[in-house]
Amino acid sequence: MRYLHKIELELNRLTSRYPFFKKIAFDAEIIKLVDDLNVDENVKCAIVAIDTSMRMQDFINEDNKDSFVLSTDVLSALFYKYLSQPFYQHDFLVLTDCVSRINELKSIRATITDEIALHNINKQIHYMFIQPYMNNEKVVSYE
């Protein structure tokens, strides 16, 4: 779990450096799954950073938009930083595809009222960044 310590240190530095930067807790279930992935530590950091950023977007409102938008942008920047040192092209393509897919699903989710369909979409969104790496297999698309 060195990766988790690494990202927590980075976020603590950002919090002390930028007063508007806000942290939200990492998703405990996602952390547990990331722990078991057979990928580089930086890829694990990237997954946690982008997962947290995308979840944080769901909490943005008029009262917190200044700090939360900044925070999601900073977390997204960390995502790109972790994937660039060294450059993990395959993981970059897989995970940026996941970001696009989550944005599509969130748009679809806004139009759905059926509870079962909403549950299924929320489940897909929740596991999106982990799914490509489950069972030590990299899956590029969700078609």
From Swiss-Prot:
Could you mention a single GO BP entry for this protein?
menaquinone biosynthetic process
- Is Calcium found in the keyword set? no
Q: Which InterPro entries match?
A: HexA
- UniProt KW Cell division keyword: no
What Gene Ontology molecular-function terms does this entry list?
hexaprenyl-diphosphate synthase ((2E,6E)-farnesyl-diphosphate specific) activity; magnesium ion binding; transferase activity, transferring alkyl or aryl (other than methyl) groups
Q: Which domain of life is it from?
A: Bacteria
Q: What class of enzyme is it?
A: transferase
EC no. given is: 2.5.1.83
Reactions catalysed: 3 isopentenyl diphosphate + (2E,6E)-farnesyl diphosphate = all-trans-hexaprenyl diphosphate + 3 diphosphate
> Keywords on this record?
Menaquinone biosynthesis, Transferase
What is the annotated role of this protein in its UniProt record? Answer: Catalyzes the condensation of three molecules of isopentenyl diphosphate with farnesyl diphosphate (FPP) to yield (all-E)-hexaprenyl diphosphate (HexPP; C30), the precursor of the prenyl side chain of menaquinone-6. Large subunit Hexs-B catalyzes the condensation reaction and the final product chain length is cooperatively regulated by both the Hexs-A and Hexs-B subunits using the whole size of the hydrophobic cleft as a ruler.
Summary of subunit composition and partner proteins: Dimer of heterodimer or heterotetramer composed of a small (Hexs-a) and large (Hexs-B) subunit.
Any idea what this protein is called? Hexaprenyl-diphosphate synthase small subunit ((2E,6E)-farnesyl-diphosphate specific)
Gene name, per UniProt, is hexs-a
